[in-house]
């Protein structure tokens, strides 16, 4: 479950494309908001912003549809329906106080919205952010809280019986940035020609990218065959990021390397057998199909 359009591809794009290509695996993307409070990189679309026409959310639905097509994901849902909860903006922004914002969402109501999907789809695995929302965005934090709550609520026969038959999800993963992977990627960027031609104001700071110690990472999904699909999906979110080869920059000016290998921490459930790396190499490791 992701907070805004574009989050899915940055953190989990290669993983989603990898599993979407497997006809025996169903990938369902749930997005919590339309990303209405985002900035806009394209000058001719600048008036779509929330402080102008406030039409960015609708435009980003189209970007998300194109990104899903690039990843091969055919089942996408907005939590509670498109527009049910609004992008809260960055932490401490005035928009955090908007009663429509996801940050202000009633946890029980939001959990029930996700439980309805879980009980319909009956997944073995769920994926979301860690408790600080990867980098402290209020919607990412709320997405974590709602997913953890729904993981438990979906299996509780007394919770929202109108939302379907109870279902116990086997594993819950949190996305992660491996510290070693971040350092290697930043080093690669500084050594590349892109570092010499990066636009003014673009930074590539490893210290600014919140990461986790390698020892905490439980699962590493290597999907080099789907790197091109991930990059294509990134390009679909053209109001939010620029992409040049393996390098991308968000509207805040921070540059990162797109990753074909994505890392996770198992938060709930039993780990499967490790690969040669000592980490799981499959989110479904140890599970019976």
Curated annotation (Swiss-Prot):
Cofactor(s) it depends on: Zn(2+)
Function of the protein: Catalyzes the deacetylation of 1D-myo-inositol 2-acetamido-2-deoxy-alpha-D-glucopyranoside (GlcNAc-Ins) in the mycothiol biosynthesis pathway.
Domain of life (superkingdom): Bacteria
EC annotation from Swiss-Prot or TrEMBL: 3.5.1.103
Reactions that this protein is recorded to catalyse: 1D-myo-inositol 2-acetamido-2-deoxy-alpha-D-glucopyranoside + H2O = 1D-myo-inositol 2-amino-2-deoxy-alpha-D-glucopyranoside + acetate
Protein keywords: Hydrolase, Metal-binding, Zinc
UniProt GO MF annotations: N-acetylglucosaminylinositol deacetylase activity; zinc ion binding
The name this protein goes by in its record: 1D-myo-inositol 2-acetamido-2-deoxy-alpha-D-glucopyranoside deacetylase 1
Biological processes, Gene Ontology terms: mycothiol biosynthetic process
Catalytic EC class: hydrolase
InterPro entries assigned to the protein according to its UniProt record, in alphabetical order: GlcNAc_PI_deacetylase-related, LmbE-like_dom_sf, Mycothiol_biosynthesis_MshB
């Amino acid at each position: 479950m992701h907070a805004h359009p574009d989050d899915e591809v940055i953190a989990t794009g290669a993983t989603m494309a990898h599993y979407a290509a497997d006809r025996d695996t169903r990938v369902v993307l749930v997005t919590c908001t339309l990303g209405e409070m985002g900035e806009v990189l394209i000058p001719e679309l600048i008036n779509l912003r929330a402080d102008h026409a406030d039409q960015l959310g609708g435009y980003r639905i189209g970007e998300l549809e194109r990104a899903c097509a690039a990843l091969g994901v055919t089942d996408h849902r907005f939590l509670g329906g498109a527009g049910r909860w609004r992008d809260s903006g960055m932490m401490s922004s005035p928009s955090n106080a908007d009663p429509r914002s996801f940050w202000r969402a009633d946890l029980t109501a939001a959990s029930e919205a996700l439980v309805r999907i879980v009980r319909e789809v009956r997944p073995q695995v769920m994926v979301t952010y860690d408790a600080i929302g990867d980098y402290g965005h209020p919607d990412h934090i709320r997405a974590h809280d709602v997913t953890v709550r729904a993981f438990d609520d979906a299996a509780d026969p007394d919770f929202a019986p109108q939302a379907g038959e109870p279902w116990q999800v086997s594993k819950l993963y949190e996305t992660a940035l491996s510290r070693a992977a971040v350092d290697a990627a930043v080093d690669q960027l500084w050594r590349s020609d892109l570092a010499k031609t990066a636009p003014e104001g673009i930074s590539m700071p490893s210290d600014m990218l919140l990461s986790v110690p390698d020892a905490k990472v439980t699962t590493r999904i290597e999907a080099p065959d789907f790197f091109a699909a991930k990059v294509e999906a990134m390009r679909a979110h053209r109001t939010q990021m620029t992409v040049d080869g393996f390098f991308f920059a968000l509207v805040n000016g921070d540059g990162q390397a797109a990753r074909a290998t994505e890392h996770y921490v198992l938060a709930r459930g039993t780990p499967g057998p490790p690969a040669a790396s000592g980490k799981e190499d499959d989110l479904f490791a140890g599970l019976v199909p």
